[in-house]
Amino acid sequence: MIKPRIIVTGATGKTGNVVVTELLKEGYLVRALVRREDGRSAHLKAHGAEIAVADMSDAERVADALKDVQRAYYCPPFDPYMIQGAVAFAVAAKEARLEHIVGMTQWLASPSHPSLMTRQHWLVDRLFSMTPGVAHTIVRPGIFADAYLATIGFAAHLGVFPWFGGNSRNAPPSNEDIARVAVAALTDPARHAGKSYRPTGPELLSGEDMAKAIGRAVGRSVRFVPTPTWLFMKSARMGGMPIDLLSNIRYYVDDHSLGAFELGAPTADVLDVTGRPPEDFETIARRYAALPPNRRTFGNWVREFAGLLLAPLVPGFNLDRYDRELRRPFPSDPQFAPDSKVWRREHGIADPPAKPAASAHEKAVSATGRGQWLESQ
């Protein structure tokens, strides 16, 4: 019996690549949708995937890519035009009579978040759930282990783990576990249609916990160092992160400090959906530590030390001006995820204990501060 053809968007990305590989192992026909052909797409083609090239906002090319496809893994491009791409995909999915979409979204997705990307994730989730005749499964991880391990080379060579999460914790999942949850949903729509899953690691970890795990992975003592947001943003820019992503990520630093990623974590979703326990952070860290750029060599040490010296000198982006020039919409009452009643209700998070009523003076101070914050946007 011929198995369904499944299209994977973002097929050369962190989860898409694994989704393609796992589906091919299980004998599915896989069409990998990529923005351009390169060595990564050639690798997927060599392993048996069909390659389709399309910009996600190009409605006609996306419609062509979905011909003769029955199921889809949808990982949206993280750019300001996410909604354009999602609408193009939903229209094509309806015309192609897709059976099932497994959509990658965010744990933070909510309608009044200050991040445009996060508000768009919330809308995309609803768009696919409303697409007639197409079943929908949501995969909504928090910050991946991959994000924390972006600095493992720094830790390996200089013994320092930069931390931007304040006193909060997270149970970060691996790219592989997130992808395996998506694959399980794609291969059994009857079981997973209409459901939402939050892949996590097996335990909540603080910055200090992660530093110790990384130290064991790289074979040296590593201490975590709280990093101010301005330095984190400069380092991210130096690492090649584009301004449109940084404009959103600055808010996730605040969400992290507010404890958004420890709420409701860890979950049993990876085990329940895939039948395998999630990878622990140290196991993931050992895999990253073994990569050539992170191995402890003199050349790598020079690169990391130079990065340490240069990061504070990198000019920062004016993110508020960028948002204004693009005329980005902004909610009238912006709320980080833990402060949003809608987010808490939709994610099964109990409301925090009621705070004592504020005095007139406290209300005045709060209103003044909020007004200044909004004006800065």
Q: What are these model-predicted stretches?
A:
Residues 48-50, 136:
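Short, conserved active-site loop motifs that form the nucleotide-linked donor/cofactor pocket
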Residues 231-377:
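A hydrophobic C-terminal alpha-helical subdomain
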Residues 30, 47, 362-365:
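N-terminal cationic amphipathic segment used for targeting or macromolecule association
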Residues 43-46, 53:
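N-terminal Rossmann-like NAD(P) cofactor-binding subdomain of oxidoreductases
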Residues 1-43, 57-60, 67, 78-87, ...:
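Oxidoreductase cofactor-interface core, primarily capturing Rossmann-like NAD(P)-dependent enzymes
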Residues 75:
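Catalytic metal- and UDP-sugar-binding loop of GT-A-like glycosyltransferases, i.e.
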Residues 54, 227:
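Cofactor-binding loops of NAD(P)H-dependent oxidoreductases
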